[in-house]
Amino acid sequence: MYKGIAGSEGIGIGNVVIIEEHEIVIENKKITDTDAEIARLQGAIEKFVNDTNAMADRMEKTVGAKDADILRGHIQMLQDPTIEEQITALIVSEKITAEKALDQVLEQTAEIFAQIPDELLQQRATDFRDIKARILKILLGIEDYDISTAPAGTVLVAHDLTPSMTAGIVAENIAGILTEVGGRTSHSAILARAMEIPAVLSIDGICTSVKNGDRVVLNGTSGEAIVNPDAETEQKFAELLEEYKKEKELLKKFAGVPTVSADGTKVELVCNIGKPEDAKKAVECDGEGIGLFRTEFLFMDRDTIPTEEEQFEAYKSVAETMKGKPVIIRTLDIGGDKEIPYLGLEKEDNPFLGYRAIRFCLQRTDIYNTQLRALVRASAFGRIKIMVPLVTGVDELRSVKAMVADIMKELDAEGIAYNKNLEIGIMMETPAACMMADVLAKEAAFFSIGTNDLTGYTMAVDRGNSKVAYLYSAFNPAVLRAIKRIIECGKKEGIMVGMCGEAAADPKLIPLLLAFGLDEFSVSATSVLKTRKTIADSSMAECKALADKVMACATEAEVQAVLAQQ
């Protein structure tokens, strides 16, 4: 059995087709006609742009505009004027080939992103290397395997599936995907989920461990794959596949209905999004609102701070898409771990404990005031709420509320409409906020528990460090006690308490969260129906009995043992 990262859920059974990467050999030779070489480069770039637009158009018809935009983003990345200028300057100054110059510039750019300790930004390195490889192949006349010709029942095996490769997939012919690299946030995982193809990623050496035609069964939910299984194992996976199909069909009946427990307790089931266009997916998947809109995307992949108008349009579009449903927008959560040169952030030894999020914003009030103005203005177009990240004390919340009050006075003077009852809440993700939750609940309009960071900070663990990653678990009694305390403090003051971390969609944790009194579950759009079903299958009496047993546990192992008995 091969174990990897669960990239896209589902069961797959099929035959291996290995996507082999052609070796790209770049000659180290000098040229004399630099104009001709620059013309070669421009011709290759033009073909790349045309091919990419065609692929994106095909992808939009099959999986939608959001995922097609990943490919269109490659064009935007390449059209950064400084990149082509650097390549042509190298051709002229060093008298080297277009291939050599392109390779140097794009590899240097990719390496910058690869060094950033942020999984989403590291993905930019993969993007630039994909762009580089495709243009080099155009220059060298190399043609890749046409994935669109893969026969039905194919399990694609590759070192990595780039967006350009994935664009050619005919979804009904692909039973599964196995790769040697990639994670949950990689483009290969995102596109596999969009096409509903089970995928297991980051299986070391899988390309050399299988051969074309090998039989494979895989579980994209657990991250497991078996090559050339015996008849009994394949039959077991065939049964799992049928069960999975039945479950997907069953979930359809949970669309368009309220989120209510088996004994009538109503909760809100909303979505996490990262871009304005994601709001459409939230609506399509029956989300009841937006529980977390990360605004960092507006500040990335650009050379200047986004204007008030740019931000206003982004926030307004989400509010309008949600048509009166609640939209919680988290203010800028950025720090030294993210490469945004124009912000002038210094590299820090421990950026997750450093100058970031609200700490950065309250010192750079020029940037923060612009964002808050845009948010307050956008509140006139829907049920927008403002959420402040990484709060450790009530003084930070008071500072934000004071800034918003001043902005409202300005807008009154300017005759600009806004919601005068705009709510300002807190992302509860630090031990300090947990300890001060009783005080914070008196001044915050709502709490939203960010379990990802709350777990990391509470357990003092870097989840990227494999030696201590075992400590990173929301099932640890310390984390569960923190969550329970936050909810209790919020309830005492009568404010809404939600959760926007991964724990909100965990079927084993949901009964505990219901017992604790969580009001709002914010999950990925694709998890909405599954989470609603889990809640509908839960009775509060049983949840509370389970929570009593769990809260008496002293270790995570004890917690897991109790949950395993349910």
Predicted regions and their residues:
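Conserved alpha/beta-domain cores
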Residues: 248-566
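Non-catalytic, soluble scaffold/interaction modules
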Residues: 1-321, 327-334, 364, 368-372, ...
